[in-house]
């Protein structure tokens, strides 16, 4: 209510905001105004965005525009360039260095990281440094003070898995426990039951991958990939590459390649140091953009615009500073044991297709094979590098079918197939040819040996042919298995044994190629993968993916006997841990095989002891489970008996615990079921 004019008004006393006597403010400006103070200008602003590029060519005014275009084209890949300054002398010549200013500090740091030691040509290698580093290095104190000694860090033994006394292999099982949570279980393949070594929840976001020799395992995450190793799988290194889709590891495990999504970069890393060695731009994840390694990690190559680009991994520069240009090249592949590249060139008008073997680093052509009427080629190296097979899809005639006014498709008619076999260990590399008229469904080399197998014909009734290749002789057909319903071939890594698989029906045939006897047949409904262990003793078939029922894996012996069935909900992947090549010489291996019989008694004795111990443990385990069940059942029976009075009250004092207790409420009904119907024809 308003007061009249002249009346005294009452106001509340204002609070006192003064600090009490002796008050000490312990809140710093950084805590109070942190966001604001971070925007405060400083002396290094602008300088952090500048880099210095040394060792650029010294040119005059006439050649300066070309030099400027080349330098700016190289450095714009690191970020947005604001300004480039080229100091010049009195005669208008450049002084051999330049200053490049980027939009932000991150771009400048990326330029230093990725373009330092960039090979401009065979005479000039660019040296890139941050401009701010000059001040840092000029402030180095004159008196040297020794660094503080760091405590010794015990390194994890990355090869511990090879010290297992009985040479039992390891494997990992990947499954999704809950949506978005992937579990990885590591096991030792002991008999009769595997031994769990480690189980990791949320170990990866998608899947895992072993390195070629089994030293490392790679996990995938949103921020990048992580490499693990050692007996307890500790972190060895992590590599920041957002949304990396998959990885590749070099044969000798020195380098890791991460592939980003379509249109993003491909990065080569040093596994041990974590250093970024080289980056490439992806062309949409086509097969041609994949990097391919030589057997010794010395070279890495890729196919770009009718050129094979081979990089020497000692510097990660192009070999001889230039690409190998091959017009019409379609694909290439390294030998698994030698620095030899095999590539094929498509057929042109009046120019035949050809397959060429080239030795690296000399780039000399070792062998060329001309081919006619070629639609496509597939290159298959034998694991030992002794043979190369080029599967050639050939046609009798072709015709063009127009898609629109500009484009047209080529349709091939009268298809037949040739297998060109190159004998790599013989003088002048002779080539033999095997012709097959029927459709080829699969091809596979025996990893250790001289045989190869082919599935040909109609999928519903195919034939499986086995050929033997010997030195100085043409391939010989040694066996033909007719009317087989299969589409995949899986050789044992030790040779001799092979699995003929039909993954659509889930049927498998185990064949011994010494006498081509079918040892066993089996089935695993909806099996989608087949994995041999490194020793060739066991085979695993797995069901995952779209199959919602019966997910899990079966383990078989090499003879086709099922050893165990494991049903696992949301099973994703089963992977054997690879092993490195043996250190024993061929002579030593032959000596061991020769004297193997005298070791049989030792092995059999050890196996019996292990099985006896395992049986005893299994009996004890079952007895313990039986005891637990009996105890649990006794408790439940006692509880049920104690509740009888309450049940009687609920049922009008009628005992319904047994059928005989209340016969008036029991109805007897006879049901007839037709079990079998036999029909006898009387003449």
Curated annotation (Swiss-Prot):
Stretch list, region Disordered: 1-25
All residue ranges annotated as the RRM domain in the record: 49-133
Coiled coil: 611-638
Entry-linked SMART domains: RRM
Compositional bias per record (Acidic residues), positions renumbered to this chain: 9-25
UniProt-recorded Gene Ontology molecular function terms: RNA binding; translation initiation factor activity; translation initiation factor binding
Matches recorded under Gene3D superfamilies: 3.30.70.330, YVTN repeat-like/Quinoprotein amine dehydrogenase (2.130.10.10)
Protein name as it appears in the record: Eukaryotic translation initiation factor 3 subunit B
UniProt source species: Anopheles gambiae
Gene name of this polypeptide: eIF3-S9
């Amino acid at each position: 209510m308003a007061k009249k004019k002249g009346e005294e008004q009452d106001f509340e006393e204002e609070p006192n905001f003064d600090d009490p006597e002796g008050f000490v403010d312990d809140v710093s400006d950084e805590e109070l105004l942190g966001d604001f103070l971070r925007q405060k200008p400083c002396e290094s602003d602008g300088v952090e965005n500048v880099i210095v590029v040394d060792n650029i060519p010294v040119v005059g005014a006439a050649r300066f525009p070309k030099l400027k275009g080349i330098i700016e084209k190289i450095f714009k890949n690191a970020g947005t360039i604001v300004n480039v300054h080229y100091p010049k002398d009195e005669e208008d010549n450049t002084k051999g260095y330049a200053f490049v200013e980027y939009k932000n500090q991150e771009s400048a740091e990326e330029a230093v990281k990725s373009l330092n030691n960039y090979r401009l040509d065979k005479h000039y290698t660019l040296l890139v440094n941050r401009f701010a580093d000059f001040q840092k290095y000029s402030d180095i104190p004159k008196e040297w003070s020794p660094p503080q000694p760091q405590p010794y860090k015990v390194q994890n033994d990355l090869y511990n898995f090879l010290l297992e006394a009985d040479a039992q292999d390891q494997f990992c099982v990947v499954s999704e426990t809950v949506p978005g949570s992937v579990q990885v279980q590591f096991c030792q393949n002991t008999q009769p039951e595997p031994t769990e070594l480690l189980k990791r929840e949320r170990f990866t976001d998608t899947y895992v991958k072993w390195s070629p020799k089994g030293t490392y395992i790679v996990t995938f995450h949103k921020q990048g990939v992580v490499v693990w190793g050692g007996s307890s799988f500790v972190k060895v290194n992590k590599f920041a590459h957002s949304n990396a889709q998959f990885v590749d590891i070099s044969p000798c495990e020195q380098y890791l390649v991460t592939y980003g999504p379509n249109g993003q970069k491909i990065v080569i890393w040093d596994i041990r140091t974590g250093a970024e060695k080289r980056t490439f731009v992806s062309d949409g994840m086509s097969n041609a953009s994949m990097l391919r390694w030589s057997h010794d990690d010395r070279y890495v190559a890729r196919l770009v615009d009718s050129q094979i680009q081979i990089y020497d991994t000692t510097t990660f520069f192009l070999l001889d500073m230039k690409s190998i240009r091959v017009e019409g090249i379609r694909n290439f592949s390294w030998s698994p044991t030698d620095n030899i590249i095999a590539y094929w060139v498509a057929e042109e008008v009046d120019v035949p297709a050809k397959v060429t073997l080239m030795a690296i680093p000399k780039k000399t052509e070792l062998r060329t094979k001309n081919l006619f009427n070629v639609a496509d080629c597939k290159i298959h190296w034998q694991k030992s590098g002794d043979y190369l097979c080029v599967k050639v899809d050939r046609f009798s005639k072709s015709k063009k079918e127009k898609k629109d006014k500009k484009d047209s498709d080529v349709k091939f008619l009268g298809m037949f197939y040739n297998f060109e076999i190159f004998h790599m260990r013989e003088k002048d590399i002779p080539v033999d040819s095997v012709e097959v008229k029927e459709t080829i469904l699969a091809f596979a080399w025996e990893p250790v040996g001289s045989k190869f197998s082919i599935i040909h014909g109609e999928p519903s009734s195919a034939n499986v042919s086995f050929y033997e290749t010997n030195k100085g002789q043409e391939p010989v057909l040694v066996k033909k298995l007719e009317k087989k319903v299969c589409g995949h071939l899986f050789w044992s890594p030790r040779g001799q044994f092979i699995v003929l698989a039909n993954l659509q029906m889930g049927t498998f045939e185990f064949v011994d190629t010494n006498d081509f006897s079918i040892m066993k047949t089996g089935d695993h409904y909806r099996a989608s993968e087949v994995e041999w262990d490194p020793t060739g003793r066991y085979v695993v078939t797995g069901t995952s993916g779209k199959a919602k029922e019966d997910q899990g894996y079966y383990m078989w012996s090499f003879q086709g006997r099922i050893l165990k069935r494991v049903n696992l909900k949301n099973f994703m992947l089963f992977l054997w841990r690879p092993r490195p090549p043996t250190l024993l010489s061929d002579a030593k291996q032959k000596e061991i095989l020769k004297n193997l019989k005298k070791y049989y008694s030792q092995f059999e004795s050890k196996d019996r002891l292990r099985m006896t111990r395992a049986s005893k443990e299994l009996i004890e385990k079952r007895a313990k489970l039986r005891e637990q069940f009996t105890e649990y059942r006794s408790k439940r029976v006692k509880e049920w008996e104690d509740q009888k009075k309450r049940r009687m009250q609920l049922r009008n004092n009628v005992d319904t615990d047994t059928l005989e207790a209340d016969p008036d409420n029991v109805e007897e009904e006879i049901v007839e079921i037709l079990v079998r119907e036999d029909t006898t024809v009387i003449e």
